[in-house]
UniProtKB/Swiss-Prot annotation:
NCBIfam families: QueF-II. InterPro entries: GTP-CH-I_C/QueF (IPR043133), NADPH_dep_7-cyano-7-deazaG_red (IPR050084), QueF (IPR029500), QueF_type1 (IPR016856). This is NADPH-dependent 7-cyano-7-deazaguanine reductase. Substrate binds at residues 74-76, 93-94. Catalyzes the NADPH-dependent reduction of 7-cyano-7-deazaguanine (preQ0) to 7-aminomethyl-7-deazaguanine (preQ1). It comes from Paracoccus denitrificans (strain Pd 1222).
Amino acid sequence: MTETIYSGLKQLGGATLLPESPDKAELERVRNPQADVAYNVRFTAPEFTSLCPMTGQPDFAHLVIDYVPGEWLVESKSLKLYLGSFRNHGAFHEDCTVSIGRRLAGFLAPRWLRIGGYWYPRGGMPIDVFWQTGPMPEGVWIPDQDVPPYRGRG
């Protein structure tokens, strides 16, 4: 069999159970065939869930992850499973958002990465969390995240 950039992936193309926790989730990556070009990749997770570490109640967020890849691309199914592993994980909004960004940045070594966590209200107040690796790169089209502020029923 011919070796490809997809060789070695374990989760893509088959049934895979949701990891028990973010620490047990296995991210996978593939070589970027366009590594000589600076471009933006966006992942949106509009139904992200985790648990409040104090009450065990579910928390919900709309996550937007932008990154300008270097040598590596995250394999999207592994990212989906990693994000899904937070479903039974207790952590505050800030910790969830920043830890996702830091893990992806450490794993992929992108030219740049940012994450916006737009958390739905708990206690009547939405919490939005933003993290990025450094200044936005020049010459790359990086659209606004365009997640409107929470308005409730108004």
